[in-house]
Design a protein with these regions (language model features):
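Short, charged, amphipathic alpha-helix that recurs within catalytic cores of restriction-modification
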Residues: 95-133
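A short, terminal or domain-edge coil/loop segment
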Residues: 3, 100-112, 165-177
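Structural alpha-beta junctions
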Residues: 37-44, 79, 108-115, 133-140
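Active-site metal-binding core of divalent-cation-utilizing nuclease and nuclease-like domains
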Residues: 2-26, 39-85
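Conserved catalytic cores of phosphodiester-cleaving nucleases, focusing on short active-site segments
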Residues: 70-102, 114
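Domain-level recognition of nuclease-like catalytic cores that cleave nucleotide substrates
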Residues: 120-176
């Protein structure tokens, strides 16, 4: 890293640490949305990203008509057709209760990919919880803050054609469960 590179994000490096879990959650949601869901792109010009933290900007209705508010929502316009949704958790949000009350309804939304972002070190616990509740997660991601900003790691990949051809024991090892 050169000195020029090191100082380009000095404002980011000097941001004060969050003072509460809520402040950390809000900051993480905003940073993850910018890092991973920055739509529209040239390839997906109709996609738009909405962040529902700290205030709800685009609620999502489930099949029963109940409103849910995922942290991050990506829709295809016109028509606001739901494509992706993401839930960002802090360490205290990786629990059975949270999974039952929040993750299960999000994973049941039709025709949408559900991504779950948990802090580094909580990926295994999140996968075990999701397996116990039969939650279909399209992608597990871990996040943490480093001096340069947020770092996001993919800890699973969506099932593909090759996955179906693998023996069950190999699929289980790849999922980390």
């Amino acid at each position: 890293m050169t000195i020029d590179t090191r100082w380009t994000d000095v404002d980011k490096m000097l941001q004060p640490a969050p003072k509460s879990r809520q402040e950390l959650h809000e900051r993480a949601v905003q940073d993850i949305a910018l890092a991973r869901f920055e739509f529209p792109t040239p390839e997906l010009a109709g996609y738009r990203t909405f962040v529902n933290v700290p205030e709800v900007t685009l609620p999502v209705k489930d099949e029963d008509g109940n409103e849910t508010n995922p942290d991050i929502v990506v829709v295809d316009t016109p028509g606001n057709i739901l494509k992706l949704l993401a839930q960002v958790e802090t360490a205290d949000g990786v629990t059975d209760e949270r999974a039952r009350d929040v993750w299960v309804p999000f994973s049941r939304l039709p025709d949408a990919a559900f991504y779950l972002f948990v802090p580094v070190g909580y990926g295994g616990a999140a996968k075990r919880i999701c397996k116990s509740f039969d939650i279909d997660v399209y992608g597990y991601r871990t996040w943490r803050y480093v001096p340069e900003g947020i770092e996001i790691n993919d800890i699973s990949e969506p099932p593909g054609i090759m996955t179906a051809l693998m023996p069950p024991i190999v699929r289980k090892m790849l999922r980390g469960v």
